[in-house]
Amino acid sequence: CDEENASILSDTIMRAERDGSVSHGLFRLPAYVSGLVSKKINGKARPELQNVAPSIIKVLGNNAVAPMVLSLGLPAVIDLAKKNGVAVLAITNSHHMAALWPETEAIAEAGLVGIACTSYKPAVAPAGATKALYGTNPISFAWPRPGKTPVVYDMATASMAMGEVQIAKREGHKVPLGTGLTKDGKETTDPGEIVDGGVILPFGGYKGSSIAMMV
């Protein structure tokens, strides 16, 4: 992993840990290291920016970690939005999106409204089902407030982020009923039964399920 990639990734981990998002802080470090060792993550990647349309840009991640990709794409999409009034940034071939709020917050701090979302590998069963179809598919929103900090939220469309379930398993905590199902499709408060072959449920039943589908 070269210095630029390492610096950007470590800053992302530090900010998540600082802001209390334990599931996206130091907890993620072993997975990042494993990805670098296995070559799933290109630690020397240089993402490429492409202009798709007047208000649409795309960044080819080249298997970089997402914060590295966003370091190129975020300033570009902010400039484009200020020029055209609206802009869209699409990201492909990046590894693990990390938390979304640092990016939407940066957009709001630039005086713009930001919305971000990402899909992920299946871990969440649709409402009424017992098999995974959706990822935890988070969505984040930020709104600027002149002279004040922006209004920002970042949430999984699952009942709980996968990282939070994994941390609960590691620390021996129970999770609320309704968080997920066992591999046999039964409700459980044991995070281990969810992580090891089970599924997470969407938040709010069919409402969260529909938002996950949209993402």
Annotated model-derived regions:
Residues 5-9, 25-28, 32, 69-77, ...:
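General structural feature for long, well-ordered alpha-helical segments within catalytic domains
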Residues 24-78:
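Active-site cofactor/substrate anionic-group-binding motifs, chiefly glycine-
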Residues 54-56, 86, 198-200:
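Short, solvent-exposed beta-strand edge segments and adjacent coil->beta transition regions
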Residues 57-146:
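A generic, well-ordered mixed alpha/beta core segment in the N-terminal half of proteins
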